[in-house]
């Protein structure tokens, strides 16, 4: 059986080497793009969590005015539902809590004391930290 060289030249398609080069290029792009994408997703979750804490802080201020309260000691998160509609949930599954004493960890992990008459809002999801309105601006 003889192979006809003329019929081989007329065939169309990709060689194995060409396909391997394409696969190698795609793998390289994925190796660069995937970590950047995952980092962006994690960063957006933290920013959403922070925005939720800001919404809770705004609702707490509204509660304080409506109830003519001197401070936040008698307030609970569930008391904020008239202003929030529903208590926001952390996009990564964490739960929010409000404290009027103690401290809250900021984005660097440093502990910041909650000033008298103020409140601190925390998310129990690791890496999401907390927020004190008027103290923590980032």
Give the predicted meaning of each segment:
Residues 36-53:
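Aliphatic-rich helix starts adjacent to a transmembrane/signal segment
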Residues 58-61, 65-126, 137-138:
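Extracellular/periplasmic head regions of type IV pilus-like filament subunits
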Residues 20-36:
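Alpha-helical hydrophobic helix detector
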Residues 132-136:
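Pore domain of cation channels
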Residues 49, 126-129:
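Histidine-centered active-site/metal-ligand motif
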Residues 13-14, 19-21:
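Secretory/exported precursors with cleavable N-terminal leaders
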């Amino acid at each position: 059986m003889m192979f006809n060289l003329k019929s081989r030249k007329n065939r169309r398609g990709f060689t194995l080497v060409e396909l391997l080069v394409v696969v190698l290029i795609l793998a390289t792009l994925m190796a660069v793009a995937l970590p950047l994408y995952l980092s962006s997703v994690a960063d957006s979750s933290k920013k959403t969590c922070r925005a939720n804490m800001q919404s809770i802080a705004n609702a707490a201020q509204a509660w304080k005015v409506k109830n003519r309260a001197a401070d936040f000691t008698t307030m609970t998160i569930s008391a904020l539902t008239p202003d929030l509609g529903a208590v926001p949930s952390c996009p990564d599954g964490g739960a929010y809590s409000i404290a009027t004493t103690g401290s809250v960890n900021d984005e660097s992990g440093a502990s910041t004391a909650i000033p008298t008459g103020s409140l601190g809002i925390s998310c129990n999801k690791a890496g999401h930290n907390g927020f004190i309105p008027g103290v923590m601006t980032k």
